[in-house]
Every structure is written in C-alpha cells, then in structure tokens.
Amino acid sequence: MQNNCHLSVLVHEQAKRYGDREMLVYQEFGDKEWRSLSWNEVSRMVMRISNALLNLGVRPQECLGIFSQNSVQYIATDFGAWGVRAVTIPFYATSSEQQIQFMVNDARIRFLFVGEQEQYDKARRIFSLCPSMERIIVYDPTVRMSTHDPNAIYFSDFLRLGDNLPRQTEVEQLQAEASYDDIANILYTSGTTGDSKGVILPHSQFHAAFEANGKCVPVTESDRVMNFLPYTHIFERGWALYAMTQGATMIVNTHPQEVQQSMRETHPTCMSAVPRFWEKVYMGVMDKIERSGAVQRRLFRHALSVGRRHNIEYLSRGKTPPVALHLEYEMLNRTVFSLVRKELGLENAHFFPTAGAAVSAHVEEFVHSIGINMMVGYGLTESLATVSCDHLGEPYTVGSVGRLIEGIQIRISEEGEVLLKGPTITPGYYNREDLTKAAFTDDGFFRTGDAGYLKNGELYLTERIKDLFKTSNGKYIAPQMIESKLLVDKFIDQIAVIADQRKFVSALIIPVYPLLEEYARANQIPFDNREQLCDNPRVIEMMRERIDTLQQQLAHYEQVKRFTLLPHHFSLEKGELTNTLKIRRRVLNENYKEQIEKMYLD
C-alpha cells in the first residue's frame, strides 16, 4: 500500500496502519541471532530520538553525521532526525579519517553517530581537528570508549534523553512545519577522481522518486526486503525508504560480506544489488556444476538452454512461449532451478533491482534463465538513484538499462553525454556553487558524465566519458565494458584495464587466490607464496587461455594482449578504490607504474 507521506512522519503513519506487524529483522551487534521489531516499536524509538535531539539543542536543517554499518539504530536515527527537520549525512563505514574530517568540517556537524569500534576510534582521533564537533554517540554497546573521552556517550544513554517524550509537543510542531523543500540528506561522493562533493537531496526528491518507483517496481507489504548495500549508497537508501512506504519488512544486513548467509537464513523476496554480487552468484553456481558428475552437468546445461529460450527469447520480448517449451520449462523450474534458488536463499524471490555498474549480458541472461527477476537500472546519487530500469512484468532487452521512470526528461548531447532533468534531480552541491553551475546546462539539464543512447524507448550506456581511453593508434576503448566481460571468470577477483595512449590493451589482475591455490595444488604447481603463483608460467598460460576465450567477441583492438597478476588486492587504504569499490584509475597508474611499464617493453 502506497504511503508517500513526508519522511518526518512516515514511520509513525505506518505504525498506525500496521501496528505490531514486523518492520525490521536484524541482528544485534556481535550477535548472530535474528530478531525483529514491529512498526509500533520502531515508531516509539524514533519518537525518543527526536525528543533526545531537541534536548541536545538540534535545530531545523542542522546537519547530523552517521558513520556506521547498516543497523536498526541507523534507520531510527534517520527518521528521528527528520522528525525534527534535521539533515542526516551518512558516511561509509570504511571512510578514512581524512574523509570524515572533511565532511564534518564542511557540514559543520556537531553530533556524529558511530557504529562499531573502528568508527569510534576514527571519530575520536579526528575530534580535535573538527571545531564544530561536540558529541560522539556510539551505537554498539560493546565499543570500548576511552576513559579520557568526555565527548562520547552510548546510544542507550542518548535515548534516555528522550524518555517520556519531554519535547513531544515541539516535535509535532516541527513535523507540522516540515516542507518538501527541506533537505533530507547530503551525500558526499568521492568519485573515481577523488574530488569530494556533497549532493543535496531534499524531501521533494524522495517524494517524486517514491511516486515513480511505485509504477515500475511495485513492492508490496508482503515483501521481505534485504538491505545488502550500505545505507550510505544512494541505491540502497532510496530503495529501502521506498520499500518502507509500501509497508514491506526490512531485513537489515550489517556486513555486506555476510549477505549470502543472511539470505539463506532470512529468505528475502527482494534486494537491491550491484552486478558484482550476481557475478559471484554465477561463478559459484557454475563452479559447483563443473565439479558435479557428467549427468548433472548435461542436465543443468540443458535446463539453462531451456530457461534462456523461455525467459529471454520469448518472455523478455513480450511473446508467449510455445506450449511444449513452457511445459518443459515449468518442469525444470520445479526440479532444477528451484533447488538453485533454495541454495541461494532465494526460493521466495520476487524481483531484484540491479545497478551501480555495467552488467555482463552473460550474467544477466543466467539470472533470468534460472527464474530470478533481475531488474537492471541506471542512476546516480544526483538523481536519487533511479533514472531508468526494467519494469516488472514488461518486455526488456538484455544489455539496456531499462526505460525512463516517470517524470524524467532525457537528452543526448552532441558528444553523446546523457543529460537529465526532472523532480528527482538534485538542486546542486552543498557549499559548492561552482560545481553546481558546472554540473548543469544553461537550460537546466544535469550533466551525468555518462555516454549513452536511446533505442526503442530503452536507455543504453556505453561508458563514463572521462573513462574512455584512446590508444596511441587512435582507437577508443571502453575499459569498464572489457572489465565486466572478464570479471565473470571464476579465477578473476579484480581487474583494471590499461590502454590510454598505449599501443595495445593490457590489464592488472588480482586472482581469486583460494581457487588459484587449489588449482595449483591439483596440477602439481609448486609455490610458497602468492608472488610465486603470479610468476608461474603455467598459471599465466592458464589465465591467458581463459581470458582469450572470454574476449573472443571483442574487437581485436579491444582485446587484452598482456596482463600482470598481482599478489595483493586493490585497497581503500591506498586510495585505489572508492567507498563503493570502484577503481581509481589515476591512483592505480601511479601505484603500479613499474608493472604497467614492464608490460609495454618490446
């Protein structure tokens, strides 16, 4: 049921409707047992937070920071802050001290909510460098706070400031005064170039996004929605809040690396995901099939072929499958695909929005073939996530990012850049009029930085404009497209394509070391460490053969001619990845200059 009211009162309005129905399923800090809270219970917690914030002197449109993993406390803090017209600024739990310091000072944050020990320790170290900071509020009760830290309190103590709702009349007055022009969030994006900017997201953007999403991705109150990505990620934030407007139950996954176990334990019907999640699902399933007997392999390959014909060649194009094909698919769906979905914890799968990077057509077809509705989409922080997406139950094309959501205007510039206008587009960047002016055309269209085109009403993306490489031979290379094709290999964990102003394409590759070590032992390849594996000619030849197989469909000038295996992962700490785990090519070029140059020696 749609309940697109102002976020300042959403939880309370839903509590009137759903009462003691389950709203949040979660695990306590450090505990593996799944618990739940009802709409009524969360509403009461949110009221206490709103009252506590007023007791601390929080003012309308004041910025509050949340530096935490996903948690019940995180969700409640958002709503409690909106209940007094405050602005929340979410930080990634992996943010560096330098990033935190910049965001706190830029937004003049007085109160910073933190999750676990790592976040508390970082916040404490930068406290004296942030003149505006007054208090650190710690969610996890097991965090060891310094005995010499008078500026930190536990969340439980903070909540007591709101006991008996001493300021409830003022809270309700503020909610009555709340405007859709109020800022709800400021999301700082570092991007792949390292420049940090705060994207302003007013309540009006959320309101428009919820209305549009309801017409293409219809969540219902019976859905159980897994929150996999961090709430700092605009895709998860927009998606989770929209699902709450529909009365769905939220499953709060605190640590992304544990999501597959969480899915098996909680059986979600929906979840927003990035392509890398589905790539790992694909590799895991296919690896298990390859290890099975010959009969099982033949059966599964046949089932995939039937699933592809039924779901891709017919249903995706809006056509009715032949009766014989449909009957065979239904039989295989009950006997083969249902077992795969059950193993993944997706036996109740409804649909799964997917965005954040390019999706390999191979992986997308696999997911659809086994009976999971993957709804590919496109969006940015500045567009409050969704710009376009596949619409549930309607035809779609593998390789596109779907049709535009309602209210979005699109234009493709002469340079091929996707330009956007509409009620879900940000008004600009916090404290950065210069960046705001540069981000929009004279007639108000937002410059996405993405190259793309429209075909038959669907949007197709080609590459980030700034990421396009030009080889020394004058050929243009789209590195993300090449990377997405190679990442489906079970032995490849991370990859960075090199080509700009070079005579051919090369790549830095981090293997999946547990699998590579297993391969080496099975083939009597001696090694004492990862460096020896990376340099072993037999390992390199095996990787070369797999890469050549995957890139057969690429143009000759797009194919990786040489590669280097690296013994260590690209890391956040070295600045090689953004907080959303996208590679920073400039930093990689600097950090691995020696290895790159070696690949281009004649």
For every predicted segment, state its role:
Residues H207-R224, Y231-F337, N348:
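Conserved AMP-binding/adenylation subdomain of ANL enzymes
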Residues V11, N55-L56, G83-L161, M542, ...:
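Structural core segment of the AMP-binding/adenylate-forming
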Residues S43, M47-R48, Y180, V199-T220, ...:
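Conserved structural elements of the adenylate-forming
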Residues L24-F79, S96-Q101, Y154-D163, H203-S204:
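Conserved AMP-binding/adenylate-forming core of the ANL superfamily
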Residues L404-T471, V488:
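Conserved ATP-binding/catalytic segment of the ANL
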Residues G19-E22, V138, I153-S156, D163-Y188, ...:
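Conserved pre-ATP/AMP-binding loop-to-beta segment of ANL
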Residues F469, Q494-V497, K503, I540, ...:
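Conserved C-terminal "lid"/linker of ANL adenylate-forming enzymes
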Residues S36-N40, E177, A184-F210:
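Conserved AMP-binding A3 loop
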